[in-house]
């Protein structure tokens, strides 16, 4: 299907997200910027409205708040929480890549780490709410894979 058809179906299926996109576009046209819950701002000083009603940079206007909030705010917050949960174990957080947290799991602690990740999953929304004072009305869950390397992983959460 064409891009226009795809977007039309998207906005019909996800009306709340479409309304939020419209709100972001209005914010950019009124203020020239978007402010996300963490306080980070994205400036769009050259944004203009086309005769069709759409605005320039609309893809960035829709994408920056989501990608930024996820990778620059939520992931580090949860990374610190998971690191704290693992603090008494031999297993440890060794890296983060985009929206992934990499944990080196000691062989004897696999079940314990899995339990702690389930716990972190249960705490996720309340941690975000406490830090940023927002309530998510969309699912936000951790996913976990385990393996000896990135190529040989299996889903565990």
Regions picked out by a protein language model, each given a short descriptive name:
Residues 1-157:
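Conserved catalytic core of nucleotide polymerization and phosphodiester-bond processing enzymes
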């Amino acid at each position: 299907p064409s891009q226009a058809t795809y977007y039309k179906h998207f906005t019909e299926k996800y009306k709340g997200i479409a309304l939020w996109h419209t709100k972001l576009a209005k914010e950019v046209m009124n203020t020239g910027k978007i402010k996300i819950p963490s306080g980070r701002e994205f400036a769009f000083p050259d944004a203009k409205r086309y005769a069709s009603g759409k605005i320039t940079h609309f893809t960035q206007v829709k994408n920056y708040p989501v990608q930024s909030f996820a990778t620059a705010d939520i992931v580090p917050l949860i990374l610190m929480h998971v690191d704290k949960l693992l603090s008494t174990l031999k297993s440890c957080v060794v890296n983060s890549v985009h929206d992934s947290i990499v944990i080196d799991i000691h062989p004897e602690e696999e079940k314990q780490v899995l339990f702690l990740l389930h716990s972190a999953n249960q705490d996720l929304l309340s941690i975000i709410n406490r830090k940023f004072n927002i309530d998510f009305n969309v699912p936000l869950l951790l996913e976990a894979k385990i393996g000896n390397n990135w190529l040989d992983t299996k889903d565990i959460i």
